[in-house]
């Protein structure tokens, strides 16, 4: 959320025709930076700047943030609750927590400290300590010496509430801002709009926009663009189009708005509708930019219309619009996925001829193409080129190679590549650790599996369902019911992850064999309480 705030602030200070603004769409290849887990076209007005501006914290404040966060985490570990267990009391206080907070020696709890603590609480994917975060927020903002001028802690808490779909709580916080005369800005509503859209509540997002003036916040062109951007990103193209049509006379559309509409229709798979907007854009005298063309090319490639994509690419060149790395990556992807390495290299060579510098995603595609061809030597050559050119390497760069090494069951090769990853100062992600642990489980290297899990914990890399399935299955296979049970409970209670039925039954079987009938009953009851299994008849 801090990133969103810095982006929005800078969006306001930049002209809509600034040459810097096309960076708005620079995240269009996000998926390839995260193991293809997300859709690639993530271009939005809110992505104007890619580097967050961190609050200015003193070393003392940073330590204070860590202390508060540690107390919250410890309390959550002992009292795990799902954010959706019940409707929260907005005035929630937790007496034991308040006492612990009060023990921390600090002259004043600043808004920056409060904001950072809440941001850290909400930064995890699973096991968000919402109750504890709200209790901390209420404790901090009720202190006599608290400075209520800053809206940022409120905005952060609104973002966290929206993330776990506690929208009534989010509106309560906005009302609280109003009653305390805290500034309510477009940023506040942008946060809530984004969360509504992510929750699939498009009409509520539009309603949120319409309520801005009730709180003394006048909607402007940026807010208009942000709504369209968020709806488009989540494939709510028809809602984005309706919203656009209803307000385009009030807020003059620009290349960013039209490009987001084009993207929305493309993501929804409605290429003909995207083409209509594309033509309307030109008729309105607004020239498509490199991101507009790249989005259309991407959509055509994804639906198999590769020749049409190349036609659009030719039109792009004829219009004098220079392609960038995103354009070529979009042309390259379809060939990578189809295993057409020769075509991938043709696109890459064309890219070099036109003087377009490859980026991380380009090189990641080349590595993937070579690994699909089982040509590890060429894949490593590309990796070495990246390092030599100081092109950023990321976890996905190495994960593709690790997958190939796993396929070949080359444990020594995995060790060598991991050392290379550390030398490149590239941080492993959850996928990296899962691949390596799976390989070490296969080679019966239990010590290495445990070493990887400890490293994950030390580096605060979040485990996912696959991580726990791998570890629990390993311990069950070894007959270590206690470790399997402990990890399964951690998965369900602390991380709020949903295990497969087969994994659940595997742990129950271990408990029965070990004669741990009480733990067996407790686990069954916990799973029933969480609605993960039905109560036996």
Swiss-Prot record:
Chief location: mitochondrion
Keyword set, alphabetical order: Mitochondrion, Repeat, Transit peptide
Signal sequence interval, chain numbering: none
Keyword Repeat: yes
InterPro entries: Pentatricopeptide_rpt (IPR002885), TPR-like_helical_dom_sf (IPR011990)
PPR repeats: 150-184, 185-219, 220-250, 254-288, 289-323, 324-358, 359-393, 394-428, 429-463, 464-498, 500-534
Transit peptide (first-last residue): 1-32
Subcellular locations according to the entry: Mitochondrion
Transmembrane residue ranges: none
Domain of life of the organism encoding this protein: Eukaryota
Keyword Cell membrane listed: no
Pfam families: PPR, PPR_1, PPR_2
GO CC terms, sorted: mitochondrion
Protein family: Belongs to the PPR family. P subfamily.
Name this protein carries in UniProt: Pentatricopeptide repeat-containing protein At1g20300, mitochondrial
């Amino acid at each position: 959320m801090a990133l969103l705030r810095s982006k929005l602030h800078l969006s306001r200070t930049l002209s809509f025709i600034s040459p810097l603004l096309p960076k708005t769409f620079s995240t269009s290849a996000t998926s390839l930076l995260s193991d293809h887990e997300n859709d690639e076209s993530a271009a939005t007005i809110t992505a104007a700047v890619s580097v967050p501006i961190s609050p200015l914290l003193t070393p003392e404040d940073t330590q204070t943030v860590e202390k508060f966060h540690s107390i919250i985490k410890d309390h959550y570990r002992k009292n795990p609750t799902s954010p959706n267990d019940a409707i929260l009391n907005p005035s929630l206080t937790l007496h034991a927590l308040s006492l612990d907070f009060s023990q921390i020696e600090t002259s004043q709890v600043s808004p920056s400290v409060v904001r950072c603590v809440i941001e850290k609480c909400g930064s995890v994917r699973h096991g968000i300590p919402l109750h504890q975060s709200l209790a901390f927020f209420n404790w901090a903002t009720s202190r006599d010496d608290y400075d209520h001028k800053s809206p940022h802690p409120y905005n952060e808490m609104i973002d966290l509430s929206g993330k776990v779909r506690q929208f009534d709580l989010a509106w309560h916080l906005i009302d609280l801002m109003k009653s305390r005369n805290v500034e309510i800005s477009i940023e506040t509503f942008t946060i809530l709009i984004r969360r509504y859209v992510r929750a699939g509540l498009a009409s509520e997002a539009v309603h949120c926009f319409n309520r801005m003036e009730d709180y003394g916040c006048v909607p402007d062109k940026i807010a208009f663009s942000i709504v369209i951007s968020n709806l488009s990103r989540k494939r709510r193209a028809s809602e984005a189009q309706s919203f656009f049509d209803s307000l385009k006379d009030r807020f003059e559309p620009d290349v960013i708005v039209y490009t987001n509409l084009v993207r929305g229709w493309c993501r929804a798979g409605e290429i003909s509708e995207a083409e209509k907007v594309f033509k309307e854009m030109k008729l309105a005298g607004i020239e498509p930019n490199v991101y507009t063309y790249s989005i259309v090319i991407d959509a055509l490639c994804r639906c198999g219309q590769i020749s049409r994509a190349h036609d659009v690419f030719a039109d792009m060149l004829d219009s004098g619009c220079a392609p960038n790395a995103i354009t070529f990556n979009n042309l390259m992807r379809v060939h990578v996925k189809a295993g057409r390495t020769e075509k991938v290299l043709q696109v890459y060579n064309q890219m070099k001829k036109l003087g377009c510098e490859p980026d991380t995603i380009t090189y990641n595609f080349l590595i993937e193409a070579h690994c699909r061809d089982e040509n590890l030597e060429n894949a490593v050559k590309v990796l070495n080129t990246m390092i030599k050119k100081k092109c950023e390497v990321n976890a996905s760069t190495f994960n593709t190679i690790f997958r190939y090494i796993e396929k070949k069951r080359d444990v020594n090769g995995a060790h060598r590549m991991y050392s290379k990853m550390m030398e490149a100062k590239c941080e492993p992600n959850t996928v990296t650790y899962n691949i390596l642990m799976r390989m070490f489980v296969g080679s019966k290297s239990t010590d290495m599996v445990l070493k990887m899990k400890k490293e994950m914990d030390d580096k605060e890399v979040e485990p996912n369902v696959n991580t726990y399935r791998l570890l629990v299955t390993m311990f069950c296979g070894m007959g270590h019911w206690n470790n399997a049970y402990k990890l399964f409970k951690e998965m369900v209670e602390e991380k709020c992850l949903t295990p497969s039925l087969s994994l659940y039954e595997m742990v129950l079987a271990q408990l029965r064999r070990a004669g741990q009938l009480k733990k067996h009953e407790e686990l069954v009851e916990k799973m029933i309480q969480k609605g993960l299994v039905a109560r036996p008849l």
